[in-house]
Amino acid sequence: MHDFLKAFKDAFPHTISIFLGYLLMGMTFGMLLAQQGYDYKVALFMSLFIYAGAIQFVAITLLSAQASLMNVVIVSLLVNARQTCYALSMLDRFKNTKWRLPYLAHALTDETFALLNLYAPKKGVNETDFMFSISLLNHSYWIFGSLVGSLVGSHFSFDTQGMEFVMTAIFIVLFMEQYKRNTNHKNAWLGIAIAVVCLALFGTEYFLLIALVLMVLALILFRKQLEC
């Protein structure tokens, strides 16, 4: 228990920026869900067991449109397909996490993945406990935001337009932090180039998954050149 608390204290400061973003986005989700007539229990269930910001927002539209189960499954797979790339890249780090593995896989959101690759535990801190703490903290922030938003949204009406930019801003900050920490910027510029080309060719609706697949392939094929 002492080792876990040590890792928890080490992980917490790294998650503060995510707390601010997840609080706002979680509240937005909860408010939108409440406006569709669903109470806090639905928000809690979705944030506990689905825990995927994009698909949770899409689910609100699907629920209001009374979409079929098959449509829900297909849309969920398409929206969250990028998580496969994240999971594959974390296989080595997760392989010795034992009973924590199912939760670490479940909680591997975009932001958690970014933090796990940006920060390392301090000397003497168990890496598995550190990764678990970051995942647990981020998940808790999302649940808290969703519950607050749901409870507030059931009593008041808010204009949530533009709130989605919060997470984009967080990603930019995390990218800049990683860019400053590393002297080799080849990976960063390669990722930017692939993303820009895919955006130009495939548009905003399809570029993300294609860009991620191409980035993974490029990192595998040109690993030695990029590490020089």
UniProtKB/Swiss-Prot annotation:
InterPro entries: Brnchd-chn_aa_trnsp_AzlC, Brnchd-chn_aa_trnsp_permease. The chain crosses the membrane at residues 14-34, 42-62, 130-150, 156-176, 192-212. It is a multi-pass membrane protein. GO terms for cellular component: plasma membrane. Keywords: Cell membrane, Membrane, Transmembrane, Transmembrane helix, Transport. It is found in: Cell membrane. One of its GO terms (biological process) is L-valine transmembrane transport. The keyword Lipid metabolism does not apply. Its main location: membrane. Pfam families: AzlC. Belongs to the AzlC family. This is Uncharacterized membrane protein jhp_1251. It comes from Helicobacter pylori (strain J99 / ATCC 700824) (Campylobacter pylori J99).
